[in-house]
């Protein structure tokens, strides 16, 4: 009789949208509402979802997973039961955990869900030794590249190191797909990245992580000063958490990607193997595990999961 989903932080939750989508509200007192995540019971950016369920006298609520957010964490279920509503918990729990993996990682591990992504040649390089232009050298095919833009639209932030910006001058935006541009997180220890690089434009917010202090930029650029040491990956995760970033896709370069692998600070890795060879160049990161392999025409996509 109705359905809904949570479109954006600060906007109505899935339960609210689902209830409002029902044209004949007289059906609600004999309905069942199915939710992937426990309905909230607190006043945050939006009113409690529990209040609306109770108001419309919906008698049955089926919950996929309990909300790990300490503000909720079972209080929503308790509130519904106290108001005479039958609550069933744990239906399709694995599927709901997968659906909400970014949210759960953010609240349980106090860091974003981290996805590593790169493309490498058949002989294991992510870039040739030299190139003529300050732009990416394409390794993967057009289908693979479109998929990358879809991924960018699904994550809250995208991260690259200094050398990737200097070598490729990437836009780090969403093209070839519909969606919002992710927040750009850029590592720039010594201040090599100037305002004429694409990552410094106003098409998206940029968080610049640097060892420099007292830097001033335009309003869309935030500078975070840290010491670049062995704890850098943890500091990046902490800064992302500080700004409420629930997911990050890391697109390079080799040193940046390898540092997250060696710190075991990643959740997924998505590796394209393109149908090209360089014979020499920048070696691809080294990652262990048994991937799932997907064919994308002449490309291969290797998918790794780093489960606890």
What are these regions (language model features)?
Residues 105, 111-247, 255-258:
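Active-site ligand-binding patch in enzyme domains
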Residues 13, 73, 98-99, 194-196, ...:
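Short, charged, surface-exposed secondary-structure boundary motifs
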Residues 2-95, 259:
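Zn2+-dependent cytidine deaminase-like catalytic core
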